């Protein structure tokens, strides 16, 4: 079994690349971290919403999806997380996660992401925060499609999921 771990806030093309790599190798578990997080700019979507985004992207492809609450204790994280995602090979492009799992003698498959900095969650969320001030849906979509898979973009638009970012940043003015 292959495991892809992330917060998926939101599920973006970097995540899609990792999950594709895992699915090509065999049965895959997608582990959604920070499952208990209260809404914030770092974690704007609930674990249920993030799972919906992932399932929308997966379509008819099969993957097991599990939710993992944070424990804020890196030395014990792998033991905690493996209670939810089971044992297998972690597929990652994150150096810190790789080292943490290797230290726990977990097999790790390293995936090299070109332009990884473009797919960092904070950068994607910052762009979405800016887009939350734009009323024109097609303009929003065109920008989002650069870093987010089309089916997830559709989910974000259909569920008015960017509005939450605007509401969390009330000092922003709407444009366009």
Feature names for model-found ranges:
Residues 1-176:
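Nucleotidyltransferase catalytic core that binds NTPs
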């Amino acid at each position: 079994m292959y495991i892809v771990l992330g917060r998926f806030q939101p599920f973006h093309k970097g995540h899609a690349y990792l999950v594709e790599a895992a699915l090509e190798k065999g049965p895959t578990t997608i582990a959604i971290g920070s499952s208990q997080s209260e809404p914030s700019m770092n974690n704007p979507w609930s674990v249920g919403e993030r799972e919906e985004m992932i399932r929308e992207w997966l379509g008819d492809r099969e993957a097991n999806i599990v939710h993992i609450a944070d424990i804020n204790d890196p030395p014990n994280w792998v033991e905690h997380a493996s209670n939810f995602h089971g044992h297998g090979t972690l597929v990652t492009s994150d150096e810190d996660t790789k080292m943490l799992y290797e230290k726990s003698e977990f097999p790790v498959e390293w995936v090299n992401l070109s332009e990884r900095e473009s797919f960092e969650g904070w950068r994607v969320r910052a762009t979405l925060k800016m887009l939350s001030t734009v009323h024109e849906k097609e303009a929003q979509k065109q920008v989002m499609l650069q870093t987010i898979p089309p089916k997830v973009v559709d989910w974000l638009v259909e569920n008015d999921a960017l509005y939450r970012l605007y509401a969390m940043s009330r000092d922003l003015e709407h444009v366009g």
